[in-house]
Protein backbone atom coordinates (compact mmCIF):
# COMPACT_ATOMS: atom_id res chain seq x y z
CA UNK A 1 0.00 0.00 0.00
CA UNK A 2 1.27 3.47 -0.87
CA UNK A 3 2.35 5.84 1.85
CA UNK A 4 -0.03 8.72 2.63
CA UNK A 5 2.59 11.22 1.45
CA UNK A 6 2.91 9.48 -1.91
CA UNK A 7 -0.87 9.37 -2.33
CA UNK A 8 -1.05 13.10 -1.67
CA UNK A 9 1.74 13.75 -4.16
CA UNK A 10 0.01 11.60 -6.77
CA UNK A 11 -3.23 13.53 -6.23
CA UNK A 12 -1.36 16.85 -6.49
CA UNK A 13 0.29 15.71 -9.72
CA UNK A 14 -3.06 14.75 -11.24
CA UNK A 15 -4.63 18.06 -10.16
CA UNK A 16 -1.69 20.02 -11.57
CA UNK A 17 -1.85 18.12 -14.88
CA UNK A 18 -5.58 18.73 -15.25
CA UNK A 19 -5.17 22.43 -14.47
CA UNK A 20 -2.33 22.63 -17.01
CA UNK A 21 -4.45 21.11 -19.79
CA UNK A 22 -7.48 23.24 -18.95
CA UNK A 23 -5.51 26.48 -18.71
CA UNK A 24 -3.07 26.02 -21.60
CA UNK A 25 -5.25 24.26 -24.17
CA UNK A 26 -8.91 24.84 -23.33
CA UNK A 27 -9.08 28.34 -21.85
CA UNK A 28 -5.79 29.60 -23.36
CA UNK A 29 -5.53 31.88 -20.35
CA UNK A 30 -3.05 32.01 -17.48
CA UNK A 31 -5.94 32.01 -14.97
CA UNK A 32 -5.09 28.78 -13.14
CA UNK A 33 -1.38 29.56 -13.44
CA UNK A 34 -1.95 32.74 -11.43
CA UNK A 35 -4.10 30.85 -8.92
CA UNK A 36 -1.41 28.17 -8.55
CA UNK A 37 1.28 30.82 -8.01
CA UNK A 38 -0.86 32.46 -5.34
CA UNK A 39 -1.48 29.11 -3.61
CA UNK A 40 2.23 28.28 -3.64
CA UNK A 41 3.30 31.68 -2.33
CA UNK A 42 0.49 32.24 0.17
CA UNK A 43 -0.09 28.72 1.46
CA UNK A 44 2.59 26.16 0.59
CA UNK A 45 5.66 28.31 1.19
CA UNK A 46 4.62 29.47 4.69
CA UNK A 47 3.18 26.03 5.56
CA UNK A 48 6.41 24.32 4.48
CA UNK A 49 8.56 26.72 6.47
CA UNK A 50 6.32 26.28 9.51
CA UNK A 51 6.41 22.47 9.23
CA UNK A 52 10.22 22.53 9.07
CA UNK A 53 10.22 23.52 12.74
CA UNK A 54 8.60 20.32 13.95
CA UNK A 55 7.92 17.73 11.24
CA UNK A 56 10.49 17.44 8.46
CA UNK A 57 8.55 14.68 6.71
CA UNK A 58 5.46 16.88 6.44
CA UNK A 59 7.68 19.75 5.27
CA UNK A 60 9.09 17.55 2.49
CA UNK A 61 5.60 16.58 1.33
CA UNK A 62 4.45 20.21 1.34
CA UNK A 63 7.62 21.31 -0.43
CA UNK A 64 7.11 18.64 -3.09
CA UNK A 65 3.50 19.75 -3.57
CA UNK A 66 4.66 23.35 -3.89
CA UNK A 67 7.17 22.25 -6.53
CA UNK A 68 4.52 20.33 -8.46
CA UNK A 69 2.13 23.30 -8.52
CA UNK A 70 4.91 25.75 -9.30
CA UNK A 71 6.05 23.56 -12.21
CA UNK A 72 2.46 23.45 -13.52
CA UNK A 73 2.16 27.25 -13.32
CA UNK A 74 5.46 27.83 -15.11
CA UNK A 75 4.52 25.22 -17.73
CA UNK A 76 1.26 27.05 -18.43
CA UNK A 77 3.08 30.35 -18.94
CA UNK A 78 5.68 28.71 -21.19
CA UNK A 79 3.03 26.91 -23.27
CA UNK A 80 0.99 30.07 -23.76
CA UNK A 81 4.13 31.98 -24.70
CA UNK A 82 5.07 29.33 -27.25
CA UNK A 83 1.56 29.37 -28.70
CA UNK A 84 1.70 33.16 -29.09
CA UNK A 85 5.14 32.94 -30.73
CA UNK A 86 3.76 30.35 -33.13
CA UNK A 87 0.80 32.63 -33.93
CA UNK A 88 3.19 35.56 -34.53
CA UNK A 89 5.21 33.53 -37.04
CA UNK A 90 2.06 32.38 -38.80
CA UNK A 91 0.70 35.94 -38.94
CA UNK A 92 3.91 37.12 -40.61
CA UNK A 93 3.56 34.37 -43.23
CA UNK A 94 -0.07 35.34 -43.83
CA UNK A 95 0.95 38.99 -44.13
CA UNK A 96 3.65 38.10 -46.66
CA UNK A 97 1.11 36.06 -48.64
CA UNK A 98 -1.32 39.02 -48.62
CA UNK A 99 1.43 41.32 -49.90
CA UNK A 100 2.31 38.81 -52.65
CA UNK A 101 -1.38 38.61 -53.59
CA UNK A 102 -1.52 42.42 -53.78
CA UNK A 103 1.62 42.55 -55.91
CA UNK A 104 0.08 40.11 -58.38
CA UNK A 105 -3.57 41.29 -58.44
CA UNK A 106 -3.12 44.97 -57.40
CA UNK A 107 -5.49 44.69 -54.45
CA UNK A 108 -5.59 42.85 -51.16
CA UNK A 109 -7.57 39.61 -50.92
CA UNK A 110 -11.14 39.86 -49.62
CA UNK A 111 -10.50 37.00 -47.18
CA UNK A 112 -7.69 34.66 -46.21
CA UNK A 113 -9.21 31.76 -48.15
CA UNK A 114 -8.45 33.68 -51.38
CA UNK A 115 -4.75 33.00 -50.71
CA UNK A 116 -5.25 29.21 -50.94
CA UNK A 117 -3.65 27.34 -52.74
CA UNK A 118 -1.71 29.86 -54.84
CA UNK A 119 0.07 31.66 -52.00
CA UNK A 120 -0.35 29.34 -49.00
CA UNK A 121 -1.39 25.66 -48.83
CA UNK A 122 -4.12 26.35 -46.23
CA UNK A 123 -5.16 29.02 -43.76
CA UNK A 124 -3.44 28.09 -40.49
CA UNK A 125 -4.95 28.31 -37.05
CA UNK A 126 -3.41 31.00 -34.89
CA UNK A 127 -3.11 28.85 -31.76
CA UNK A 128 -4.38 25.54 -30.47
CA UNK A 129 -7.25 25.81 -28.02
CA UNK A 130 -10.84 24.75 -27.62
CA UNK A 131 -12.62 27.91 -26.45
CA UNK A 132 -11.86 30.46 -29.14
CA UNK A 133 -8.93 32.69 -29.81
CA UNK A 134 -7.51 30.04 -32.08
CA UNK A 135 -8.04 31.63 -35.49
CA UNK A 136 -6.84 34.69 -37.33
CA UNK A 137 -9.29 37.48 -38.02
CA UNK A 138 -8.81 39.33 -41.28
CA UNK A 139 -10.73 42.41 -42.39
CA UNK A 140 -10.23 43.73 -45.90
CA UNK A 141 -11.14 47.34 -46.66
CA UNK A 142 -12.92 48.55 -49.79
CA UNK A 143 -10.45 51.38 -50.50
CA UNK A 144 -7.48 48.97 -50.79
CA UNK A 145 -5.83 50.30 -47.67
CA UNK A 146 -3.88 47.85 -45.58
CA UNK A 147 -6.23 45.15 -44.23
CA UNK A 148 -6.38 44.24 -40.57
CA UNK A 149 -4.97 40.89 -39.40
CA UNK A 150 -5.07 39.87 -35.75
CA UNK A 151 -5.54 37.07 -33.27
CA UNK A 152 -6.47 36.93 -29.60
CA UNK A 153 -3.21 36.66 -27.69
CA UNK A 154 -5.03 36.71 -24.36
CA UNK A 155 -8.74 35.86 -24.82
CA UNK A 156 -11.28 37.38 -24.68
CA UNK A 157 -9.45 40.65 -25.12
CA UNK A 158 -5.73 41.13 -25.75
CA UNK A 159 -5.76 41.31 -29.53
CA UNK A 160 -2.40 41.30 -31.28
CA UNK A 161 -2.42 43.10 -34.65
CA UNK A 162 0.07 42.55 -37.43
CA UNK A 163 0.67 45.51 -39.75
CA UNK A 164 1.70 43.95 -43.03
CA UNK A 165 3.12 46.95 -44.85
CA UNK A 166 5.31 48.13 -41.97
CA UNK A 167 5.93 44.57 -40.72
CA UNK A 168 5.24 45.71 -37.17
CA UNK A 169 3.01 44.63 -34.31
CA UNK A 170 0.32 46.44 -32.36
CA UNK A 171 -1.67 45.41 -29.32
CA UNK A 172 -5.23 46.30 -28.36
CA UNK A 173 -6.96 45.16 -25.22
Regions found by a protein language model. Give the residues of each.
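Internal/C-terminal transmembrane anchor helices
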Residues: 58-83
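N-terminal start-of-chain detector that recognizes signal peptides
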Residues: 66, 73, 87, 111-112, ...
Amino acid sequence: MAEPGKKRLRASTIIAAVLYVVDAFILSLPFFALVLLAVVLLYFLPATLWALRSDRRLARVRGAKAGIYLLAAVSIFVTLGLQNSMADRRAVKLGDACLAYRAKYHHYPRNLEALVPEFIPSVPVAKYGLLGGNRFIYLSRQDDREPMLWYEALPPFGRRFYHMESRSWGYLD
